[in-house]
Amino acid sequence: DVCRECGVPPGVVNLLSGDPPSIASQLISSDIIKKISITGSSRVGKLILKQAADKVQRVTMELSGHSPFIVFDDADIKKATDMAIAAKFRNNGQVCISPNRFYIQENKKDEFVNLFIEKTKKLKIGDGMDPSVQLGPLTTKKRLNEVEELVETTKKEGAKVLLGGKRPKGFNKGYFYEPTVFDNVKDD
């Protein structure tokens, strides 16, 4: 709708959601597709390369990045937290460029973390179609299970949950999960 409102002709922008391997297979095998560009995991990259090799398809890949968010001691902490929240929670962090790690210089850590948590607590969880909502559900049950498993593993490895770490109260339908902030996460 937004694209049409901005004058973009129908068919120029198309969003596909569903089973990534089957979608990729259909796109790669199509004679219409002339170039493939992907940002994703090494596993998915290998699958796409194998499929693209049959057609000698042009491919560009950015694989297995960890999108660090770095804050130095000369940073404007208010601006840094605003940018961090926008980057991290866009589409519930389900974007390949969403920061996975935050590296904060020690003398700014407490100030950054406290303000980041304060602002994150104000994010509204709910129906993603509601304009007042900042955080909708995760995309699939599988993704929800992966997030729950990741949180449990991270806690077992000694990280401390500073915020979230569970499904929000009152959201029994859908794949909702609270924004979660850890401290003392292992470097690997």
List the predicted regions and their residue ranges.
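Surface-exposed charged/polar residues within alpha-helices that form helix-capping/stabilizing sites
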Residues: 5, 25-26, 50, 149
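Beta-loop-alpha module in the N-terminal Rossmann-like domain of NAD(P)-dependent dehydrogenases
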Residues: 19-26, 40-47
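PLP-dependent aminotransferase-like
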Residues: 1-24
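ALDH superfamily catalytic-core signature
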Residues: 35, 41-187
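Short, surface-exposed connector motifs at secondary-structure boundaries
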Residues: 7-10, 28-35
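A broad detector of the eukaryotic-type serine/threonine protein kinase catalytic domain
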Residues: 18-21, 32-33, 68
